[in-house]
């Protein structure tokens, strides 16, 4: 092995130094002095606003969660009047006649009119809902339209379904049926 000169290179010194630019001085911002009183006052104001917003949220939640049925807007949404409901309704609407024999008569009358259904319990429930809707102030035409929109399979037999429902479960509304229905 031979002695070789080192291969490290060093920067050559320059004769003229580059001018230094101090940009930090151009953008210096002097901090304003704030007393502790101002700092604590700002903190108290922010805390008060936060507590106020939290209280408003809790009050709104409490009001919505503890609404009574007699208050406006608290009424439960009625179940759809479709005939293809999978589960049987738990209770018949109030304002209808109650009897298993009436239910059999109702289903037989629907069958005689050519109205088929996949769930007899849902058909009975919807028949009783016709009476509930009439008792709630709906007209026969409104009940027919609501039933058509929720059970399009009934088609042109919807009026007959409503008529059979009225005659079976709430005969006190017979007078509101259109002639010949």
UniProtKB/Swiss-Prot annotation:
Region listing for Disordered, in residue ranges: 1-21, 70-99
Compositionally biased intervals (Low complexity): 7-19
Main location: membrane
Transmembrane regions listed in the UniProt entry: 44-64
Top-rank taxon, per record: Bacteria
Keywords carried by this UniProt record: Cell membrane, Membrane, Transmembrane, Transmembrane helix
Localization per Swiss-Prot or TrEMBL: Cell membrane
Protein name: Uncharacterized protein Rv3067
Provenance organism: Mycobacterium tuberculosis (strain ATCC 25618 / H37Rv)
